[in-house]
Amino acid sequence: MPESTILRVMVSAFLVLETANVLALYLAPGSRRFNAVGVFAGWHASTRDADLHAFVRYLVFWVAGTKVIFIGLWLVILLVGDARTQLVASVAMVPAIATFYWRLFPIVRRLDRNGQVEPTGYSSVLGWMIAGFLLAFVVAIAASV
């Protein structure tokens, strides 16, 4: 498989996952599938306060919207970008994805430990899944250099 094809396949798989996440966030934010927020007790607690729930929904849809922008940019990079542009954009993805461990992972881990996430252990699964994507990006980048 040509080097740039490996990278394109990796990015395409990531975009499929992100598209599923966007659909879940927009169409079924309370779902427990993909990265919808139904796994969080706070989502369910917010439904008891209309103003708080409106704010939480706003934040969920804001996240979905930023993912749509991200997906759109990556589609342009895949469709019209040359191999070098795709490589450099993929290199930029590694630290961007890794920011999950800076702010989000400590929060979701604490919520998980405090029984605010169902199923228990969700934070570990999410952490390992993201680590897997990071590793896959690094391998695809290395194969493309």
Predicted regions, residues:
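Physicochemical signature of membrane-embedded alpha-helices that form the seven-helix bundle of GPCRs
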Residues: 10-13, 59-66, 89-95
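Hydrophobic transmembrane helix segments
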Residues: 16-53
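Core segments of alpha-helical transmembrane spans in multipass integral membrane proteins
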Residues: 38-78
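Juxtamembrane helix-break-helix junctions at the cytosolic face
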Residues: 72-95
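Transmembrane alpha-helical segments of integral membrane proteins
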Residues: 99-114
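Juxtamembrane boundary at the C-terminal end of a transmembrane helix
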Residues: 136-145
